Curated annotation (Swiss-Prot):
GO annotation terms (biological process): DNA-templated transcription
SMART domains for this protein: Fungal_trans, GAL4
Gene: CTF1-BETA
DNA-binding region, residues: 53-81
Lineage: Eukaryota, Fungi, Dikarya, Ascomycota, Pezizomycotina
Low complexity biased stretches: 1-20, 130-139
Protein name as it appears in the record: Cutinase transcription factor 1 beta
Compartment(s): Nucleus
A Pfam family that the UniProt record links to this protein: Fungal_trans
Organism annotation: Fusarium vanettenii
Amino acid sequence: MNAETPEGSAAPPSPASTSAKTVTDKTNKKRASPSGDSEQPTKVTKRRAARACVSCRARKVRCDVVEGAPCGNCRWDNVECVVQESRRRKKNLLTASTAGQPVSTEAQLRCKTAASNPMGMSTADLRRPSSGSAISTSSIDGPSSFLSNSGLDNHVPHMIYQRSGYRHDPVLLNKLHSNDGNPQRPVWSNNLMTTPSVFDSLRTFRFISSLEEQDSTAQLPAFLRPLPTKIAAEDVKYLQIKGALSVPTLPLQNALLQAYVEYVHPYMPLMDLNSFLGIINTRDGQNGQTSLFLYQAVMFAASAFVDMKYLREGGYTTRKAARKSFFQKTRLLYDFDYESDRLVLVQALLLMTYWYETPDDQKDTWHWMGVAISLAHTIGLHRNPGSTSMAPAKQKLWKRIWWSCFMRDRLIALGMRRPTRIKDEDFDVPMLEESDFEIEVLADDNTVIPASCTLVRNLDMQRELAIMCISKAQLCVCISHMLKAQYSVLIRDKMKPENTTNSTMMLFPNKQLDNVEGVTEVDHELMAWAESLPTCCQYRTLTPLDVKDGRSTIAVQRTLLHMVYYTTISALHRPQFLPSSPLQAPTTSRQVQDMSRLRVRDAAMHITRMATELHQCRLERFLPTTGVTVILPAMIIHLLEMKNPAPQARERATRGFRQCMRVMEKLREVYAAADYATGFLDAALRKAAIDINASVGPSTLAMMKRVPVEFSAQTPPPENAPYMTAAESLFNERPKEHRPQPTPTMMPPNTVNAAALELSTNSPPQTELEESPAGLTPSVSAASEEIQLDVGNMDLDFMQGHDEFDWNAVAGTDFDVDQWLQFPPEGVTNQDDNLIAGVLGRGVEEPTMSAEQALNWAINAEADATARQPDGRVQGEVPAQA
């Protein structure tokens, strides 16, 4: 549509038609024919309207603001109608009055400031929930509930106003929808501008808050660097409309900064934190300025951990909506080349790697990691800064940034099975040392971080976290060696002439598993790492004292460090179970294979125990996306062992699966990757014909019901998880009768190695996980030794209420999956019989088998190994220690 109106005619049928009869003579003269003839021609030609408000101009739709303010479109959209100052005539175009009403002083001043703030509101207050604001920058939810009154149902607001975080004011809508008790008649239908109107007070509020900004170059707070002049004016307006130039309210900013300090900076120390906080604290630019791009990236990374009440106060309905909003702001600033400092670009891009939305997103975690590494190489971050003349403080910062790149690169390779971006031989930056970290107390006059944050004021805690970060960097070196020893780059999808661009480069186990010496060397390296850990990094069972006095961040980082360690062990030993093909002779001894099975199973149990402890202490919500990376493989191992013929083994596996699922449920509230993992596991359980409710015996259920209230395992349902309906949920199905499956005659696929996880009929070696009465970790409560689970309140139906899981979207999810998690390239539905063939491994040219066949084949393959020892234990094996 063109922003034009028929000359001399009323506006088209719309809300504006109610005010068409009040056009003044002066306005009619302005709209007369250019010839000056007072008589209107029979056929008129369209021409541009004399004026159009900012909203209609941006949308390129017809505006009738000359007939009365607000225009009809703005009234329908419930937004403020603002007319910008003319750029041609350099004079103010005031909001038109109706029925000859004189223009108010407020309108004159509003038009004066409208050019610098088209939305009519303070940039700092753009995200503040207000009854007059219909703008929010997050966009994950649909606009279906934008206006529910029947009088407005037929009008679809513009996408500018259809944002997920939008929360309309019910009081305002009641006023808009009521007139003398008639809900179908809006208040503007009669005498809009001659009676006190809701819009008057809203415009007054917006007008007052907009006075503080004089021009488009002064919209950012003083502590943020202004926009570069190379960004065009229309691009600046676009960034304003999208909210990229806005910052949240001060309470939300401060809460996000505290969350960043406590739960992001410890494992990614890529900034001089005290200097950064000092700049923000003054807010006047006297201590310097920081990058808006980096600031938005910091708030995005912190939005995963900040208390939800601050996000709700900021106008966000869900944590996912808040994370998406902050990420979109950050990405827009990157796309429009706001930042030119390459070091700052590397810092912010590293934080952007924590975004993951859909599996088919081309610019996913791996993409942003690649951009960050490329920029890091261009400025020489991969070289030893000690050989340069830069200041010592800068050398330390560069070392921390480089090792942050290295650690993130290795964890992405471990979690996504993507090739590493950094090669071990391509850098010479020495290992981090404690002196490389910024360990100092925050200035007393800094009020950005509240006094309740102990970390920035406790040197011992900072020192512990620095040592943990060093240990994590050393572990990532071991991860690099593990990937090199056991995995290679393969094309995940079979290349097809008509579909050659959808293949994904992935890491998969080496075809020839004759590298026993290499695996043993890496295994010894990992054990040496664990034995040499400093005292503060050594694993210990979490207690309530670990979450007091602000020490929860140390508990989370220490536990996550060991979860990554056991995930690395699992990834190292999984390919050792079977030869590359069952037709070939084993390339490793049976004892080596058996030991690898036990190592993988023991790693899964350690991960499960740690996840349970985090859940009991309510710390699982502070896990980064790496939490999905470390928990999913443990759950799949439990899933495979649920087909074990031994009841005790099935109960143990089901118990561990449920414990991990509770943590995964919590992660679903934050990360989309956890959504896909949950749907994947539910489909896998269905295809494997596993009834999780029937797998737990009455004795276990009785023991699991002894739960103190303070550590109930009840998990609230996720806020946005539409995957499967209640009727379709696996856990709502009735238990099926057990049907013995014949041993399959077809041979297993080449990559079914992980299907042969330890599924023996005997119990595994005792670990601390099984020393408690129900096989769980002892209570973290000092006053009780009861098992900390509540079956009555337990969220076992983890897919209840969700829509059908979309397998067509699963094409490379951000999970820790390897050879048996090869998602089908074309996507499959829950009705496909060969689903688990892709789960357990699919050969390129070999036939597949059903889920039950694959799992039963794995059990039969282990029968002789189990029979060799009466207790099911490999000769010479020592029970695993905690």
